[in-house]
Swiss-Prot record:
General remark: Overexpression rather impaired the progression of differentiation. Antisense RNA-mediated dia1 inactivation was found to enhance the initial step of cell differentiation.
Subcellular location: Cell membrane
Topology class, membrane: Lipid-anchor; GPI-anchor
Main localization category: membrane
Protein name: Differentiation-associated protein 1
Species classification: Eukaryota, Amoebozoa, Evosea, Eumycetozoa, Dictyostelia
Propeptide intervals in chain numbering: 434-455
Superkingdom per UniProt: Eukaryota
Provenance organism: Dictyostelium discoideum (Social amoeba)
Reported function: Plays a role in differentiation.
Amino acid sequence: MKFKLFLLVFFVFLLPYLSQSCENTFSCPTLNQTCTGQCSAGLVCNQTLSSCQEYEKCDSSLPLAEDTCSQDGYICVSNVCLPFIGTQYPSSQCKQNSNCLMSLCAGNICMVMPGSQCQTNSQCSPDQFCSTTFIGTTSTSPSTMTLPMTMTLPMTMTLPITMTMGSSSVCTNRLQLNSQCSTSDSCQTGLACINSVCSPIFSGAENATCFPGAIEPTKAACDVGLSCLNGANGYSCKSYVENQSCDPSDEYPVCNSDYQSCKCNSKGKGSCQSYYKLTQECKDSSNKLVLCAKSKNSIPSYKDYVTQINCQSQLCNYSRDCIDPKAKVSTCFNDLFLMCPSDYQEPEIGSSSSSSSSSSSSGSSSNSTSSSTSSTSSTSSESSESSNGSNSNSVSSESSSPSSSSVESSSNSKSNHTSSESSSSDDDLGNPSSSSILSVSKLIILLISIILYCF
């Protein structure tokens, strides 16, 4: 009888625990399906209806104040209305105060608040960062904090000490090349703080000191094959292991690279997966995107619509060369669909991630919800086009390619797209079928356990 009880406990509790694997049943919702953030390319997650709906069409050629977007907080970009609520950087386009991070829209441009006060870098213009200065004063006059100090050596005295602490955060100009730095945020676009000096991105050699948190290749301090890792002497550029094992169920899964996160792989195991292809091609494309963005006073990021408008060619090359195939699945192809509609095409069903990704890479984002929500749009191009001559005109003509026809054609084919996304999702981000098999096997084990217990 005891042996039967042991078998029952083993099969019902221990064996399923030992055989369990991580699960990832991610798929891209289609039209009218429930959504929480992402939808299939060509659709937007309507927060009011909590379902995937088609983008509202509009005319990007119209002045911002005259666009036809019916919902508050929406702006016309690439001929569709996108939700830009409280996400716009200073100098970016806006229609009302709620469009701007600093809640100040004047003349259809997001403005910096008086005094240039800030809380984050995104509240400053692209050539500035939010610098915080801590202020401390001491006096004998009454104030906010009084510390009575008593010392017996052998005499006793009581000394009132008044301490007043505060901080001031203001937008400060970023540091130029070869300037002394203490954080990478303080360096100009295209530079990173390496060995305490503002240096070009991707220039950090092995063991060079660096600062972590470079979430995009356009901010990478370390050269190809290296990542900013913590060691005995602090953070420095070190080689890192691709696809190391990890446990997605951990509260803080450990991956030894800023560009990696712990995800389920096709075998139901946890592995550190990167959203970027940190290769020499990516390094070259990142530098070209940075140069273009700097010339247009925009931010070199695939989530920034200033970049999409001003540097579409460089942005799409960056997307193809730097974004890993896995990212296109987790973002439902929306970044590529909106940023590079001329490059967007339906993935082939059953194709491997390596063969289909070269023509349809997309943006990441592991901690992003909807790419459009965190995107930004700017009119800085209008002031810079006159100084950039024909190059500006050519880029401007490229940015007009996101026509409503491309939006409609991609929307019409979203059903085929979704089935292929599910297939890609199985291969790249986890195997839902394996989790289903696991559930069935657990049920069979439970039945066997009951039979053994009865007989």
